[in-house]
């Protein structure tokens, strides 16, 4: 397994690839993303351990979307079976993915605990769904400080786990080592990941502007009564957010594909879900 250093413009290619693969199988990819989110939501409802259980499933859910994207790009229809890909490749892989999930849950909950030192747990209660976000809460300086600290700490956690599911699944890297290789790959390719992040920010911003323009246009021409604009706009925004989130998760496999060599052992369970071919040098 060799780490690849890619040019910054590759980040834009990753964004385009995520959108492209979604366009190839829009219904399948959207349905799979919805099912992963629904499974995590159901897990979060388990008394006492629900939030931690849902966080534990996130690396497996990310891997499922990576495999689904790879299959869609290769002309195969991604079925709901990919949702269980983390649990179908042998006992050792299963244990490693569960360990990875436990590490992620511990890291995330640790960040929330640290933020609670600043505001007495107010941000934690809002973020984990235990309290409503009111204007008074949002304007609370302690709440804002806790929010910014949590966001700052989540960035390195995200980099640690960005490539980890793929490394465990396709290369058989142990969980702790996968975290090290993941953050090294992200840091060494910081230019590409910066362009990648900015690209997705632009996509989300453009989507929001288009929804606003569409809602205003419908109201002006009389198709949509003015009183229904907020509700309709909110519904469209939710649907658009789901679509763009699906595109984003569909693009993750391309960041992994270009940063590491493909699996070295064809025919193994992890190699059966083959990665798409790498981005050609000079393409964007």
Model segments located where?
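Hydrophobic alpha-helical membrane segments
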Residues: 1-284
């Amino acid at each position: 397994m060799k780490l690849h250093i890619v040019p910054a413009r590759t980040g834009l290619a990753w964004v385009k690839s995520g959108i492209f693969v979604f366009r190839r199988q829009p219904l399948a990819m959207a349905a799979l993303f919805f099912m992963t989110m629904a499974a995590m939501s159901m897990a979060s409802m388990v008394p006492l351990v629900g939030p931690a259980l849902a966080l534990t499933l996130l690396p497996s859910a990310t891997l499922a979307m990576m495999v689904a994207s790879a299959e869609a790009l290769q002309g195969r229809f991604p079925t709901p079976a990919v949702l269980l890909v983390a649990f179908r490749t042998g006992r050792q892989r299963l244990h490693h993915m569960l360990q990875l999930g436990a590490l992620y849950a511990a890291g995330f909950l640790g960040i929330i605990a640290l933020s609670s030192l600043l505001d007495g747990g107010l941000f934690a209660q809002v973020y984990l769904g235990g309290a409503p976000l009111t204007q008074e809460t949002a304007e609370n300086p302690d709440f804002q400080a806790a929010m910014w600290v949590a966001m700052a700490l989540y960035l390195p956690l995200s980099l640690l786990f960005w490539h980890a599911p793929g490394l465990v699944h396709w290369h058989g890297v142990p969980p702790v080592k996968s975290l090290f290789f993941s953050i090294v790959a992200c840091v060494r390719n910081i230019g590409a990941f910066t362009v990648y992040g900015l690209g997705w920010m632009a996509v989300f911003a453009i989507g929001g502007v288009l929804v606003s323009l569409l809602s205003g246009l419908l109201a002006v021409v009389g198709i949509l009564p003015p009183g229904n604009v907020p509700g309709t706009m909110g519904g469209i925004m939710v649907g658009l957010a789901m679509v763009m989130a699906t595109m984003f998760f569909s693009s993750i496999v391309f960041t992994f594909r270009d940063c590491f060599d493909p699996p070295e052992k064809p025919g193994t369970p992890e190699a059966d879900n083959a990665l798409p071919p790498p981005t050609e040098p000079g393409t964007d």
